[in-house]
């Protein structure tokens, strides 16, 4: 009898475990044994790699080895002063890499070629392209933001996206992309991460981070997950001040650290440490995680077992810039590469002086320099690269690129609500009213596609409509059996008075061709029945796909990546 009770008890526990896991979120990981990332794992026994690294090390002075640990930012401009700055950091300070930011891709390529020509050791060219090249460079493909991509259920598409971004980076001579953002954005008031995150579910964020990063690295570009140990639940911008993460270790393990652990276990090669105060890990008040040995060496390297390249976040940011000898502190904390120092001459000299005083050993500098060189070899930098300038725009903006952008946009469309099964609409109903909340021509692709199924009658909602005009418009709409509200306007305050009294006795379908956070600006819920579709953008192909979804000739598989107030929870979606 006791055995029967025991079996019953075990059975109940087995049933409850998935429920408990779903409620509590990701379970903490146990420490994992360190292992080199996939990108360099085979190089430990590669004779040619070792010979190349040895040959470079032999000809570098101590100061030049220190220089290899710096990445300096350069504007992609062709003016004389900018070119002289480029020459100085490459020839005088022997930096290990460059970060270009903003401008035209043609200028970036010309400066990249010039810098590589001047460099004694090939430069690691880095880029901050969280949603592709368009984040920084004009005339490049504009992919959706991460929070939109977080709605996509097919992670193979995210991997494909990573491969494509890697291809474009290589076309520009870029070997490192400071992406993806691995922060779990569970604070809707976050002023800096927000749509840069894949969402608020640690599971979903982790899956997207791994898929995208693998795509990058399989395409020959180092991924750098950021901002360790997690910048998602803050209401302070680390560009302006030092955010505090006042959480327990158990909370950090289950939410903030979860995507980073998954990235490490997947064998991904780069991590960026953010400027964050984490009292439960580093008790020294005001010390940023990027300068904390307990965070970098203790948590990231020893506890989580990360053996890849550790980058600081930009050292010119306000979240860290008040500290003395920033670069020296960052190296002592365990970082490998120092990103965007304010005063490179003074910082290089400070590190050199510290080595001579014994605060850092030559052995530590040598180990970091060898590590950087090994990654350079893995990224094809054993020889100086040269980027072909002619045909650059055509190579970046290809038909395959445009097709991928289309598929990503369509896969993110999410039916948030379908109360009383309003959708799909029945074509036999006849005319439908279409209320256009935006510019007159903005929804023409939608209307054209809609006309394949029904006869749409368009009404345009003016801003700050007088009460009498609003009543007439509401009465006109009420004559139709179905109303489609198409929203392309981002600033919706001028329309709120109209919707406050919008309660028709017929079904209404709200179509938001704007970012999800704008949905709450319009009152919904008072119609006889409702459906809500979040399309994220007014892209022409997206508009056509939404029309197909409305009439059931296409389906939507998207799921909301981050809650929209209390109206729609993360994970919401109807197929």
Describe every region a protein language model picked out.
Residues 105-122, 155-171, 365, 370, ...:
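Active-site-adjacent structural elements in enzyme catalytic domains
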Residues 71-80, 147-159, 241-255, 316-320:
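Active-site mouth loops of central-metabolism enzymes
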Residues 87-103, 188-189, 264-287, 478-490:
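Short acidic, glycine-rich surface-loop motifs adjacent to enzyme active sites
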Residues 1-31, 37:
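Bacterial Sec-dependent N-terminal signal peptides
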Residues 75-78, 125-135, 175-185, 225-231, ...:
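Short glycine-enriched loops at secondary-structure junctions
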Residues 61, 98, 108-123, 133-135, ...:
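Second-shell residues forming the walls of enzyme active-site clefts
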């Amino acid at each position: 009898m006791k055995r029967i009770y025991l079996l019953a008890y075990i059975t109940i526990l087995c049933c409850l475990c998935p429920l408990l896991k779903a409620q509590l979120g990701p379970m903490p990981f146990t420490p994992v044994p360190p292992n080199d990332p996939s990108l360099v794992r085979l190089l430990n026994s590669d004779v040619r790699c070792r010979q190349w690294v040895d040959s470079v090390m032999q000809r570098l002075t101590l100061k030049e080895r220190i220089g290899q640990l710096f990445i300096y930012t350069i504007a992609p401009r062709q003016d004389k002063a900018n070119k002289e700055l480029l020459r100085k950091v490459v020839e005088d300070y022997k930096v290990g890499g460059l970060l270009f930011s903003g401008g035209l891709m043609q200028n970036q390529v010309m400066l990249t070629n010039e810098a590589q020509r001047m460099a004694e050791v090939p430069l690691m060219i880095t880029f901050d392209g969280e949603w592709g090249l368009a984040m920084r460079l004009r005339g490049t493909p504009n992919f959706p933001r991460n929070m939109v991509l977080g709605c996509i259920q097919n992670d193979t598409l995210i991997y494909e996206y990573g491969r494509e971004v890697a291809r474009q980076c290589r076309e520009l001579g870029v070997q490192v992309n400071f992406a993806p953002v691995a922060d779990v954005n569970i604070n809707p008031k976050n002023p800096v991460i927000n749509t840069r995150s894949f969402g608020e579910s640690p599971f979903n964020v982790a899956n997207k981070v791994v898929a995208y990063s693998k795509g990058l690295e399989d395409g020959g570009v180092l991924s750098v997950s950021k901002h360790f140990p997690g910048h998602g639940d803050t209401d302070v911008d680390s560009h302006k001040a030092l955010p505090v993460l006042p959480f327990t270790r158990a909370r950090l393990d289950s939410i903030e650290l979860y995507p980073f652990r998954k990235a490490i276990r997947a064998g991904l090669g780069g991590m960026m440490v953010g400027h964050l105060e984490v009292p439960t890990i580093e008790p020294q008040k005001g010390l940023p995680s990027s300068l904390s040995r307990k965070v970098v060496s203790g948590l990231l390297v020893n506890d989580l077992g990360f053996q890849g390249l550790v980058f600081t976040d930009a050292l010119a940011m306000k979240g860290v810039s008040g500290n003395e000898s920033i670069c020296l502190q960052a190296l002592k904390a365990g970082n490998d590469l120092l990103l965007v120092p304010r005063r490179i001459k003074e910082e290089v000299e400070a590190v050199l002086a510290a080595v001579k005083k014994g605060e850092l050993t030559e052995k530590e500098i040598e180990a970091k320099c060898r590590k950087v060189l090994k990654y350079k070899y893995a990224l094809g930098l054993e020889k100086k690269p040269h980027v072909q300038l002619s045909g650059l725009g055509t190579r970046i903006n290809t038909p395959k690129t445009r097709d991928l952008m289309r598929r990503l946009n369509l896969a993110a469309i999410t039916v948030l609500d379908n109360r009383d099964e309003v959708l799909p609409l029945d074509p036999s109903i006849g005319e439908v009213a279409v209320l256009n909340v935006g510019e007159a021509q903005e929804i023409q692709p939608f209307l054209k596609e809609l006309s394949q199924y029904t006869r749409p009658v368009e009404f345009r909602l003016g801003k700050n409509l007088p009460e009498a005009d609003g009543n007439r418009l509401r009465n006109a709409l009420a004559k139709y059996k179905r109303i489609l509200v198409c929203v392309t306007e981002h600033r919706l305050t001028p329309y709120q008075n109209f919707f406050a009294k919008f309660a028709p006795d017929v079904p209404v379908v709200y179509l938001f061709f704007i970012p999800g956070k704008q949905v709450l600006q319009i009152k919904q819920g008072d119609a006889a029945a409702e459906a809500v579709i979040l399309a994220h953008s007014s892209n022409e192909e997206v508009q056509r796909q939404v029309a197909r979804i409305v009439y059931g000739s296409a389906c939507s598989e998207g799921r909301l990546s981050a809650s929209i107030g209390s109206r729609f929870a993360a994970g919401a979606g109807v197929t």
